[in-house]
């Protein structure tokens, strides 16, 4: 786990020049426009909270896991199951290159996150959400953000 954190830090430093870290309210607007508010019963606050605890709203966040797979982007979507990293035999359920999940354009990441919620166990896929967001009052996550 410690190694994963160090590799994440290195990844952020290497890609820092191209990195975009969104603000909470900017993400609230993007997520709202993308139809995430109440998607499969999860409020906008759930999505904003989850993104914060998964990536700190950093579009280029990458975490190398012990099994050699990598979690990518603002939602930390895993390469083994959800995206294509290269020649490895990943499942690529989202039919997207992992590199598309670490750009400032969140379209592919949002589409993939919706697929994860719909096809797995809701937001339980994300440990950050389970630990910090699940079952809590999340109304403050969109407070003062000018979203409905």
Curated annotation (Swiss-Prot):
Tissue and organ distribution: Expressed in testis, epididymis and placenta.
Uppermost EC category: hydrolase
Its EC number(s): 3.2.1.17
Signal peptide (from-to): 1-19
Keywords: Disulfide bond, Glycoprotein, Glycosidase, Hydrolase, Secreted, Signal
Transmembrane segments: none
Cysteine disulfide links: 25-145, 49-133, 83-98, 94-112
Alphabetical list of PROSITE patterns matching this protein: GLYCOSYL_HYDROL_F22_1, GLYCOSYL_HYDROL_F22_2
Cellular compartments per GO CC: extracellular region
Active site: 54, 71
Any one GO molecular-function label of the UniProt entry: lysozyme activity
Catalysed reaction equations from the record: Hydrolysis of (1->4)-beta-linkages between N-acetylmuramic acid and N-acetyl-D-glucosamine residues in a peptidoglycan and between N-acetyl-D-glucosamine residues in chitodextrins
Listed Pfam families: Lys
C-type lysozyme domain boundaries: 20-148
Glycosylation site list: 58
Location relative to the cell: Secreted
Family designation: Belongs to the glycosyl hydrolase 22 family.
Entry protein name: Lysozyme-like protein 2
Lineage start: Eukaryota, Metazoa, Chordata, Craniata, Vertebrata
């Amino acid at each position: 786990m410690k190694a994963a954190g160090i590799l994440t830090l290195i990844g952020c430093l290497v890609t820092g020049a191209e990195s975009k870290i969104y603000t909470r309210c900017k993400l609230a607007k993007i997520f709202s426009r993308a139809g995430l508010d109440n998607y499969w019963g999860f409020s906008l606050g759930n999505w904003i909270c989850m993104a914060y605890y998964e990536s700190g709203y950093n579009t280029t966040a990458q975490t190398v896991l012990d099994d050699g797979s990598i979690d990518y982007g603002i939602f930390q979507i895993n390469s083994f199951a959800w995206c294509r990293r290269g020649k490895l035999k990943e499942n690529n359920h989202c039919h997207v290159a992992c590199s598309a999940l670490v750009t400032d354009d969140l379209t592919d990441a949002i589409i993939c996150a919706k697929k994860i919620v719909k096809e797995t166990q809701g937001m339980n896929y994300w440990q950050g959400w389970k630990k910090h967001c699940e079952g809590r009052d999340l109304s403050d996550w969109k407070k003062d953000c000018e979203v409905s």
